[in-house]
Structure formats: C-alpha cells, structure tokens
Amino acid sequence: MNMKRLILPAVLAALLVSLGLVSNAQGSRPAPKASDTLVVNTTDLCRDVIGYDGPTPLKITVVKGVVAKVEALPNVETPRFFDLVLQSGLLKAVVGKTPAEAAKMPLDAVSGATYSSEAVIANLRAGLKEAAKR
C-alpha cells in the first residue's frame, strides 16, 4: 500500500514533465501575455456609423503591435449582402500590419454591398486608429 502511494505521484510527475517536453519539442508557442494583446470593439466607438440596415461593429485584435484578427460582430445587415463583405477579404486585408499602417491602407467598397462595406471600412479605420493610440 505504501509503495503504491510513493510510485503513483512519481509516475504522474514523470508523465507531466514528459508531456511538457513533447509539447515544447513540437514547436508550440506560449499564448501571448495579456499585456501583449489589445482588443478594440467598435460598437461604442462607431455608434453613428450605419450600413444599409444598421451598425456594423467589429472586434479588432492586436497582438504584439500587429493586427492578428478582425471579426464582424453581430449586426442586422442582410446576411446575403454582408456575406459579400466577409468573402471579399476586406477584414483580412489588414492582418499582419501595425494598426497605424493598416489605418492608412486603401480599402475599396464591395460591389453589391456598398453601404455595408463602407460602414465596415469606417469601423475598421476608427478601430485601427484607436488601437494605434494605445
């Protein structure tokens, strides 16, 4: 009984250590520190920016000073037209750039979804400018 109590923790410790070594050997990177990540939500920032049917807020994630992801937040735009904006690559165009660089990029409205895409571009620019300040 005493031998089992001694061996079990040792085996578990060895297993945990080996899992950590395997994880690092596979090139996994630790998650960025919270201080390395900035998230800008344009819901309040662009309250007066309206697409065809309403606001088109975005969530912009910046990691270590570079735009990592841009996501459209829930909105009331007609899905079939808003999907054109999402499929156009407009939100991905700024990924990999600093917020200041991305805010200055020329971005074109999407044909067939002009009002929605212009509102998304306005949200994107405002959010990027806000991120560049921080």
Map each language-model feature to its residues:
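Repetitive helical segments and hydrophobic/amphipathic motifs
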Residues: 13-14
